[in-house]
């Protein structure tokens, strides 16, 4: 199932008909907000407000691991994440689909596989964005 993660400026999707909100507890704690399950133009989707609903979590306070685990537990197979960021040359309001990434997520846990009983997993990060979703 496709999931959307909304960032600052997108704590809700106006056309999403919410059928259920899942309060999910993960081994990493609670996600930023309940996972909303519903339909968007007749397509079943999930939605999670990255900073909470209402917006209460600053970027360094977001429990990213709990967010990802909650979406997985709810049946997510693909994620489209929406972010508000500054730019260098694109005009304000431009939609940008990134091809590569600079990872500035230092200073926080960087894996979902931290239990000694977890499988040994190496993620190929050379092309971090799914070409089908792009």
Report residues per predicted region.
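Metabolite-binding pocket within alpha/beta catalytic cores that recognizes anionic/polar moieties
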Residues: 1-127
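Active-site rim beta-loop-alpha module in soluble metabolic enzymes
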Residues: 126-134
């Amino acid at each position: 199932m496709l999931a959307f993660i909304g960032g600052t400026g997108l704590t809700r999707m106006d056309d999403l008909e919410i059928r259920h909100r899942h309060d999910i507890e993960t081994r990493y704690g609670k996600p930023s907000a309940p996972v909303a399950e519903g339909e968007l133009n007749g397509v079943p989707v999930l939605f999670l407000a990255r900073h909470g609903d209402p917006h209460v979590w600053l970027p360094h306070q977001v429990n990213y691991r709990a967010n990802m685990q909650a979406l997985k537990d709810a049946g997510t197979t693909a994620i489209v994440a929406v972010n508000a960021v500054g730019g260098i040359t694109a005009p304000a309001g431009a939609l940008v689909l990134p091809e590569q990434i600079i990872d500035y997520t230092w200073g926080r846990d960087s894996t979902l596989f931290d239990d000694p009983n977890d499988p040994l997993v190496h993620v190929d990060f050379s092309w971090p964005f799914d070409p089908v979703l792009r």
